[in-house]
């Protein structure tokens, strides 16, 4: 079934052309971990590219380097025990582009980074702190907000821009100084079978897919300080589309799988299947259209979320383009099992998420549009959420007679906790059109003053097979406010 689905969604992916193997040692590339190999590695890549392509193969050892550029037809191949090590010196990285990276590929075809258990180690903590030191000494200019350099001047492990036919497979990517890997306006991209350890510094995303077309993200094991798998749209004239995300395991101190926050263009035709999110501070799945762009035609099927602070967060906003609200429609989320903890889900991990938007009781999943800009055509099916409950009105309270006091916050950064206290513990649904909820099971472990579901300004909703279990006096699980066409069936 998955093979058939992949064939339907993605055309055949063209990988790097592996016509011949070249050992790194033939080019004088040293494996001692102390010799800076930037020039010799680049000469090797240029040599292979000029001769029609092939693989530059690294055997056991530690290969220190600054910025290198992949070229068409060339694959870097890391054998087991081979480690490509980023230089700790910030001046060894190229800063002439919008982003800084250890490995660049710009407007190339059939490029790849593959391996048999090899590693790319960005030494991000050391690089970032050395960069901070240079900024304090006046040798590098940066506003240094919160004593952190901007993301763009800290090296990512991988940055590919406008490339076609990309393969990144069977390696470990660890310790970037910024995002771990970014694929920007690329086509025909395969990212699979990776171990991603991304907890060395702030903004350590696992993988970022930006305005790309035809992408497969599969079998990744991600441990990240920031968003795990993140789709972005930086260009208002571009779309991130035809993306298939499946069979991944994600742990983050932010969101497991996220659309946005940058959402200038849009996201279309995305399939997210059979993924596990655990020990994650924010939401298992977040979709945000807050910068004038759109999200449409998305299917999430098969999501297990364990010890995750929130399950589902869908949000329309109006952040960077005043007067142009985001749009979101045709979203299906099904076959979800989730456990929300009472305590902080990422406690003890490096770079924990901040305990934000207090005071509030433990938040519900939420689908929130804007007045006059509803989120449309939403299906939630076969979803089971175990929530700690315990909402205490003496700690924080929004009563059912105070729903108009819940702020709209169209220009705020979108986060599941952004509204502070909400009047529901299971689902908060506001500014939605055409909603279907089938076979939803909500379990609260403790008595909660809030209703399980609050429906506010919803036009057309069908709820069938709702099961709610919570201790305490029985109350109607659904509260409907300023809504039309809402039907609740057994």
Go through each PLM region and give its residues:
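Extracellular/periplasmic carbohydrate-active domains that bind, remodel
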Residues: 6-490
């Amino acid at each position: 079934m998955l093979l058939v689905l992949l064939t339907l969604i993605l055309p055949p992916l063209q990988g790097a052309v592996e016509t011949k193997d070249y050992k790194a040692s033939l080019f004088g590339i040293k494996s001692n971990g102390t010799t800076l190999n930037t020039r010799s590695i680049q000469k090797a890549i240029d040599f292979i590219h000029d001769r029609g392509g092939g693989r530059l193969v690294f055997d056991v050892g530690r290969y220190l380097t600054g910025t290198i550029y992949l070229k068409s037809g060339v694959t870097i191949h890391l054998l087991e025990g081979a480690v490509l090590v980023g230089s700790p010196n910030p001046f060894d990285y190229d800063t002439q582009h919008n982003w800084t990276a250890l490995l660049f590929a710009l407007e190339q075809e059939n490029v790849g980074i593959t391996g048999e258990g090899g590693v790319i180690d960005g030494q991000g903590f050391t690089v970032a702190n050395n960069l901070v030191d240079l900024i304090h000494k006046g040798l590098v200019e940066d506003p240094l907000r919160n004593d952190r350099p901007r993301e763009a001047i800290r090296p990512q492990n991988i940055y590919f821009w406008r490339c076609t036919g990309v393969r990144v497979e069977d390696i470990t990517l660890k310790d970037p100084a910024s995002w771990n890997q970014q694929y920007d306006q690329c086509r025909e991209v395969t990212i699979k079978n990776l171990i991603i350890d991304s907890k060395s510094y702030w903004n350590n995303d696992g993988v970022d897919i930006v305005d790309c077309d035809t992408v497969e993200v599969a079998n990744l094991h991600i441990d990240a300080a920031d968003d795990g798998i993140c789709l972005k749209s930086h260009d208002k004239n571009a779309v991130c589309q035809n993306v298939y995300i499946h069979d991944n395991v994600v742990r983050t101190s932010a969101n497991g799988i996220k659309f946005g926050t940058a959402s200038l263009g849009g996201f279309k035709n995305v399939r997210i299947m059979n993924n596990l999110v655990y020990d994650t501070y924010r939401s298992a799945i977040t979709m945000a259209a807050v910068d004038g762009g759109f999200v449409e035609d998305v299917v999430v099927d098969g999501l297990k979320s364990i010890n995750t602070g929130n399950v589902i967060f869908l949000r329309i906003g109006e952040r960077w383009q005043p007067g142009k609200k985001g749009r979101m429609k045709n979203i299906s989320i099904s076959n979800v099992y989730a456990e929300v903890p009472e305590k902080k889900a990422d406690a003890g991990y490096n770079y924990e998420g901040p305990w934000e938007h207090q005071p509030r009781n433990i938040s519900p999943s939420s689908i929130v549009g804007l007045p006059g800009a509803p989120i449309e055509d939403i299906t939630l099916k076969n979803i089971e959420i175990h929530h700690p409950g315990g909402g205490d009105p003496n700690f924080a309270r929004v009563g059912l007679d105070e729903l108009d006091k819940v702020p709209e916050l169209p220009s705020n950064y979108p986060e599941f906790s952004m509204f502070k206290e909400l009047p529901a513990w299971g689902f908060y649904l506001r500014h939605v059109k055409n909603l279907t909820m089938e076979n939803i099971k909500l379990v609260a472990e403790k008595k909660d003053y809030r209703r399980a579901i609050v429906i506010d300004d919803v036009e057309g909703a069908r709820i069938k097979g709702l099961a709610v279990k919570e201790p305490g006096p029985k109350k109607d699980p659904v509260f409907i406010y300023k809504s039309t066409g809402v039907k609740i069936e057994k």
